[in-house]
């Protein structure tokens, strides 16, 4: 049976400012298709902490799902950690992610900025799953 870890990243999760519904929904959907969730965690926005926790998840599970820490603010450093962990040489611009970001922001009446465009940069050897 395929196993999965779910790691939620964000200080706002830890302090209760934002309710973590992502890991709940991800766990439900993975369970429906026969994936065993063998580890879930929530951590803050610290690079060393993210890297350490993701290394733990990689050792525990076949698949690691990461949610959070991918927004447009300076403390959103998940992709920096993923780049380091995956030994990636750099980032690639994802047209698919750019379209998703544009759709979400346009629907909310928010202007797209350079910071939002940077959200479409993903580590070369990571796969992004829309939530």
Task: Report the location of each language-model feature.
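An anion/phosphate-binding loop that grips the pyrophosphate of nucleotide cofactors and donors
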Residues: 61
């Amino acid at each position: 049976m395929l196993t999965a870890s779910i790691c939620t990243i964000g200080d706002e999760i830890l302090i209760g400012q934002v309710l973590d519904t992502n890991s709940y929904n991800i766990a439900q959907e993975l369970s429906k298709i026969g994936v065993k969730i063998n580890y879930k965690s929530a951590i803050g926005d610290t690079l060393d902490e993210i890297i350490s926790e993701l290394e733990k998840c990689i050792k525990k599970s076949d698949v690691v799902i990461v949610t959070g820490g991918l927004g447009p603010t300076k403390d959103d450093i998940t992709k920096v950690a993923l780049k380091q962990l995956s030994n990636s040489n750099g980032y690639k611009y994802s047209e698919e992610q750019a379209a998703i970001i544009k759709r979400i922001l346009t629907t909310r009446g928010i202007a797209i900025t350079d910071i939002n465009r940077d959200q479409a940069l993903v580590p070369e050897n990571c796969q992004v799953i829309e939530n």
